[in-house]
Amino acid sequence: MKRDNIIFDIIEKEHQRQLKGIELIASENFVSDQVMQAMGSCLTNKYAEGYPGKRYYGGCEVVDQSETIAIERLKKLFNAEWANVQPHSGAQANAAVFFAVLNPGDTFLGLNLSHGGHLSHGSPVNSSGVLYHATEYNVKEDTGRVDYDQMEEVALREKPKLIVGGGSAYSRDWDYKRMREIADKVGALLMIDMAHPAGLIAAGLLNNPLEYAHIVTSTTHKTLRGPRGGIILLGKDFENPWGKKTPKGEIKKMSQLLDSAVFPGIQGGPLEHVIAAKAVAFGEALEPEYKTYQAQVKANAAAMAKAFTDKGYKIISGGTDNHSMLIDLRTKFPDLTGKVAEKALVAADITVNKNMVPFDSRSAFQTSGIRVGTPAITTRGAKEPLMGEIVELIDTVLAAPECDKTIGAVREKVNGIMKEYPIFAW
């Protein structure tokens, strides 16, 4: 068979881009060689609709083993009673929970997207906002932190069936205990999407939502540093509160509803090659050095946040508890949009993403902020001293975003710096 040089040349271009640049997108990371090897394995050839021991195809006895290992490692990692490793993505995991818990038109409550939430938590352009009645809570304008009092007010008024916590651009830890109290007051289930901080939670550096949430979802990439995919967890399994029964008349456990929601509810065959890669990543996360890595992610984020603040930038909420920070550019550069900032920084081989900030006057296509994070740069072996250097380079570009000479000079420095750092240093 003829080698597809067109595609493999493109793959090599992307490899060089990753190798030469500084990756600061908070949702990105670099996986180990063994995670990539598992993803590129012959397991991709196997169809395996169903779950271990209960498949709709023959010949699944081997992939049953790898999927079972993934489940058991994941449960150990987060101290969970039950886990599903089949969702193809975090959004699919969230959609499965909604499918299990809500009926079309039912009300749920999630964090406003422009305040740090996620598309799959009720955006009108997402299925979650089309199929269900989405209501929202915000962060406080003065502190940039989640307004739990407002969350409670909205919950008491709207009586949601589900309350959703977690977000895509929120740099503080969450008060899961308070959220569970609010959920209990209105008879709602509490779902936490821990996609962004999952690795830090696994390492014991942030609060574990499984102590309070009825259901927890996550991606397996980002801070968790696995392949792209999703998971669903239960700290403790429980009988579904709506009295749904099995054909034998027994009340179904929530785990049964969630399993059915993933397959056959919203997915068909699972990606067993990706599930094997998830198992590898979960195994890595159970090793002692993983905690050291996550502590460095957090330390690097704190150092970067301080460097930005010292340079006169405003960080929403005033700092970070996790791996990320949302920077409001208007304080230092009132006329600079996130779109222009992102383009200029990418040209300098520093990858970030434009992001709306709370109470933003600009659209999602322009934005007044950028989001940055430290998981990927930490995977490459960077430590606190480099964070200050990176912020200095970012500041140089943002002060002259249209100057090709400045951008070229910064790009040369970036490429020189990153020669000293392998893609995966752990």
From Swiss-Prot:
The record marks H221 as: Plays an important role in substrate specificity. It is found in: Cytoplasm. It comes from the Bacteria. InterPro entries: PyrdxlP-dep_Trfase, PyrdxlP-dep_Trfase_major, PyrdxlP-dep_Trfase_small, Ser_HO-MeTrfase, Ser_HO-MeTrfase-like, Ser_HO-MeTrfase_PLP_BS, SHMT-like_dom. Its cofactor is pyridoxal 5'-phosphate. (6S)-5,6,7,8-tetrahydrofolate binds at L113, G117, H118, L119, S363, A364, F365. Its main location: cytoplasm. One of its GO terms (biological process) is tetrahydrofolate interconversion. Belongs to the SHMT family. This is Serine hydroxymethyltransferase. It comes from Parabacteroides distasonis (strain ATCC 8503 / DSM 20701 / CIP 104284 / JCM 5825 / NCTC 11152). The gene is glyA.
